[in-house]
Amino acid sequence: SLSHEKFFSLGSGPGRALAGREELYKELGYKDSADAAVLVLESDKVPPQEVVEKVARDTGVKAENLTFILTPTRSLAGTVQIVARVLEVALHKIHTLHFPLEHVVDGMASAPLPPPAPDFLIGMGRTNDAILFGGHAHIFVKGSDEAAAKLAKELPSSASRDYGRPFAEVFKAVNM
């Protein structure tokens, strides 16, 4: 996430990989470099100069070569870009289950598109509920039948202890 004073946004896109701030990039041994970067921000506000400068430092890209795409969570664009990450969500869970990512051969996924929301929390709830309760991911893996069967049992969101609770409720409980 990016924040400064009253500005807060979740970010995604190639700029995130360039910054490499998340532990996942270290675990995967992934490093990227580029002269320009794009970040999709879940915000309806242009980031302040302090945030732009931080992103420039973190990515190693000059501020004038950064592009920020604003997609408020409560907008149609925000809804689409969040729900489109259903395969990313599945791969993230595969990683947290310690299934070797190099054994994932292919994948495809889809989720229903909920209507835009009147505010951030409702938008977060609708989009994540669409992924968790309406999303379908088809993951093709190599390896033993036992490992594939274990993954098939543990991967679905229905295996979560929070399954059935609306995401907005879980989000509010964790962030309040």
From Swiss-Prot:
UniProt-recorded name of the protein: Methenyltetrahydromethanopterin cyclohydrolase
Gene coding for it: mch
UniProt xrefs under Gene3D superfamilies: Methenyltetrahydromethanopterin Cyclohydrolase, Chain A, domain 2 (3.30.1030.10)
Single Gene Ontology BP annotation: one-carbon metabolic process
GO cellular component terms listed in the entry, alphabetical order: cytoplasm
Alphabetically ordered keywords of this record: Cytoplasm, Hydrolase, One-carbon metabolism
Enzymatic class: hydrolase
Statement: the UniProt record of this protein carries the keyword Cytoplasm: yes
Location in the cell: Cytoplasm
